[in-house]
Amino acid sequence: MAKTVVRKNESFDDALRRFKRTVSRSGTLQEYRKREFYEKPSVKKKLKSEAARKRKAKKKRF
């Protein structure tokens, strides 16, 4: 869980910016979006192999 303590004399915008940066670095939103809906194991397997195929093709190009 991302936690941000507002510093003395820090504006709300700066604190919000630091919080957003902390959340994005920790991967909280990505994890939430990944688990938002249930995926059947077969679909997960298909997506995983598709991603591997894309990575392999991209690596082959360069």
Swiss-Prot record:
* Positions with biased composition (Basic and acidic residues): 43-52
One GO cellular component this record assigns the protein to is:
ribosome
Gene coding for it? rpsU
GO MF annotation list? structural constituent of ribosome
Pfam families attached to this UniProt entry:
Ribosomal_S21 (PF01165)
Q: Where is the composition biased (Basic residues)?
A: 53-62
- Which UniProt key words apply to this protein? Ribonucleoprotein, Ribosomal protein
Annotated region (Disordered), positions in chain: 43-62
Q: Which family does it belong to?
A: Belongs to the bacterial ribosomal protein bS21 family.
Q: Which GO terms describe its biological process?
A: translation
> What lineage, starting at the top, does this entry show?
Bacteria, Bacillati, Bacillota, Bacilli, Lactobacillales
Q: Which domain of life is it from?
A: Bacteria
**Under what name is this protein listed?**
Small ribosomal subunit protein bS21
Source organism of this protein record: Levilactobacillus brevis (strain ATCC 367 / BCRC 12310 / CIP 105137 / JCM 1170 / LMG 11437 / NCIMB 947 / NCTC 947)
Protein's UniProt keywords contain Phosphoprotein: no
